[in-house]
């Protein structure tokens, strides 16, 4: 009876407001209701759909206390033309409160060319640091204790080479490999789907990735062996649901490759991590982050029969959306980044890079990157968003959007499974990056 009464009131409300609503067009993305009520989450079961923070299905977060126990890592992505310049920026960020490093490499490094190769002409040091030798890597981390800082390296096709260099530099510093903390992106499938910086065909590339899984599980156990990346997929034009669907489909492919190579699910799954994009639609993004955790946990438990809770936890890094920055009126980008930061924090990110206001124009100035870092610090210490775990949990709108994004993502994953998985979807051209026409 209560539901019937609510339905009647809602119908009357919508009829009364129809003319006003018609003046405001729908925004892109999933279809939104004008107002949300308990009717939008009928069948909702708290323990099944949400649970306690830090417990399966991890909708509310992968840690029981989330930011009340420890804030997210403030990991600013940076890379200048030379190792010396990049080292200077890394040290500046650490001195100003950055709690992790994130290395950007130039395109020749990303696709395995030395700077003196003719194929590298015109691209050396343009979008990141050029690393050709072990000496370059030593300079990059000069006066930075690799035993005390965690480092993320955005490197894919030659990930094994850059990781080997990093381990060698740490050994020279006296830091054993089993004490190193950090992440290599190492996500080659999204290169075929969204970026195009690959070296080898898909299947040989998958072998390199599973070799890294196995090596690190035995020798660098604190290292995150992959950052399965939806960020680039979103930047290439996907929706929120497609971002998590295509990325989780890639994650399934990596797991299947590792299992086929003889590894056991709980020996490596706990070190798989993800990388999401934060766009401007704050509440939709929060719902996306929550849906991704629940979907991954369900897949690991029901499809791959993981036993260790760590294997089911989707831990993720977030970067604010580069595609949302404008070259015109760049100071407005500060506000955009602040909104995206709030979305990432309310969505439960483990680490965060905030873009600088001028990145649509050039590498960020020192002043701009300081503002970007301070944005995180203000949200962390002054907004109150870090005081409550999953502050939007229970919202009719957020729970309904979480369900809708998860359902749409599941449908895409089903389609990819029918093709034989992400590798086959790429080989068939269904999930494949094509360069935009000039």
Model-inferred region functions:
Residues 203-212, 330-333, 408-427:
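Phosphate/diphosphate-binding loops
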Residues 248-251, 284-372:
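Glycine-rich anion/phosphate-binding loop at the beta-strand->alpha-helix junction
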Residues 433-438:
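Conserved small/polar residues in nucleotide/adenosyl-binding loops
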Residues 2-279, 284-285, 303-306, 310-317, ...:
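Catalytic alpha/beta active-site cores
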Residues 122-126, 192-199, 235-237, 276-281, ...:
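Short beta-alpha connecting loops at secondary-structure transitions
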Residues 217, 259, 277, 291-305, ...:
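Hydrophobic alpha-helix feature that most strongly marks membrane-spanning transmembrane helices
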Residues 133, 375, 394:
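Residue-level signature of catalytic and energy-coupling elements of molecular machines
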Residues 1-8, 106-109, 390-399, 403, ...:
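Often metal-dependent polyanion-binding catalytic scaffolds in large enzymes
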